[in-house]
Regions:
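N-terminal Rossmann NAD(P)H-binding glycine-rich loop of SDR-like oxidoreductase domains
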Residues: 8-29
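Rossmann-fold scaffold of SDR-type NAD(P)-dependent oxidoreductases
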Residues: 12, 79-88, 129
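Conserved glycine-rich Rossmann-like NAD(P)H-binding loop of the short-chain dehydrogenase/reductase
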Residues: 30-43
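Conserved residues in the N-terminal Rossmann fold of short-chain dehydrogenase/reductase
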Residues: 38, 65-66, 106, 200, ...
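Conserved Rossmann-fold cofactor-binding substructure of NAD(P)-dependent oxidoreductases
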Residues: 63-84
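Conserved Rossmann-fold NAD(P)-dependent oxidoreductase catalytic core, especially the SDR/UDP-sugar
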Residues: 87, 91-151, 155
């Protein structure tokens, strides 16, 4: 954590699952201060009490700022003295954004513009923004707003020297057991004795843990070039496989009920499009997609010719490694939430 020694890190949307995971990872390191910026005072108060109870010796490193990324003044107020930012604030529920698309634009697009504008003015050195696989070939309002967020990030990266402020983006799939995700819903349905509800058995989704989400952001922080999009080579599984893995751990004979696809959902998700794969750089467990550095003076590019392109096809949840039930169970058992719920269930 030497890059963070005595530094101030700001997390927008910091009371969510990602912010909690970062606090658990960072608080006992040599980081100077972590600023939690969010609009929900109750969640901030809950987080304050939680970390004062479990990490009293370092809890004073957490500073809380109430504000909204939609409000530039509140963002600027929290930005003074910040070295680094993890931008996680977002509206991310697909069905909700279908009914309130302009709200998704206000938070995910205009809110990101506010964060980046304030950060550049304040001299923040490194910003990592969190996006989603739903931004690739988007069919819903949430994904479309995140795709526009990524365009804002790339455009902003062109306006500031990277040695002054580096801005890059991570894109990932479903984070298991994060707030609002399906696995905690299923666990509650099992505990209540109700059938677990799935949308479409053959639907596929990328899966990763919160720890892997933090790892991806840290990889982007250390290795990304301004304007980059970085993704992890995540595995995937069908919704049916995930449901059978969860019921297999808790109640093998539990009923699974198919309820149909919700508003705005896709049968499979894409982490990298064909067009992005043409320029992607393979970094082992990750792909790096550099931004297009050309300007609007196209005449010189017509004269110089096209650049060399990769032959990769799109990277999606159908053509990545598809895990079976036992492999998904193994991933689930690596999660503290699942282990704790199983222990309580078996009492």
């Amino acid at each position: 954590m030497s890059l963070f020694a005595n530094k101030t890190l700001m997390i927008t949307g910091g009371t969510g699952s990602f912010g909690n995971a970062v606090l658990n990872r960072f608080l006992q390191t040599d980081i100077g201060e972590i600023r939690i910026f969010s609009r929900d005072e109750k969640k901030q108060d809950d987080m304050r009490h939680e970390f004062q109870a479990k990490m009293p010796e370092v809890a004073e490193k957490i500073k809380f700022y109430i504000g909204d990324v939609r409000d530039l003044a509140s963002v600027k107020n929290a930005m003074h003295g910040v070295d680094y930012i993890f931008h996680a604030a977002a509206l991310k529920q697909v069905p909700s954004c279908e009914f309130f698309p302009i709200e998704a634009v206000k938070t995910n697009v205009l809110g990101t513009e506010n964060v980046l504008t304030a950060a550049i003015e304040a001299g923040v050195k490194n910003i990592v923004c969190l996006s989603t696989d739903k931004a690739a070939y988007p069919v819903n309002a949430m994904g479309t707003s995140k795709a526009m967020m990524e365009k804002v990030i790339v455009a902003k990266s062109r306006t500031v020297a990277p040695e002054k402020t580096k801005i890059c983006c991570t894109r990932y799939g479903n984070v298991m057991c994060s707030r609002g995700s399906v696995i905690p819903l299923w666990v509650e349905q099992i505990k209540a004795g109700n059938p677990i509800t799935i949308t479409e058995p053959s639907m596929t989704r990328f899966i990763m843990s919160l720890e892997e989400a933090v790892d991806l952001v840290l990889f982007a922080f250390e290795n990304g070039v301004s304007g980059d999009i970085l993704v992890q080579k995540a595995p995937a599984c069908t919704i049916e496989t995930l449901a059978k893995a969860v019921t297999g751990l808790f109640a093998p004979a539990h009923e699974i009920k198919v309820i149909g696809i919700r508003h705005g959902e896709k049968m499979y998700e894409t982490l990298l499009t064909n067009e992005e794969c043409a320029n992607a750089i393979d970094l082992g467990n990750f792909y790096r997609v550099p931004s297009d550095k050309r300007d609007l003076n196209y005449d010189k590019y017509f004269k110089e010719g096209d650049i060399e392109r990769n032959v990769l096809t799109e990277f999606n949840s159908n053509n990545t490694d598809l895990l079976n039930v036992e492999q998904v169970k193994e991933k689930l058992l690596s999660l503290t939430y699942i282990r704790d719920e199983l222990a309580a269930w078996k009492k």
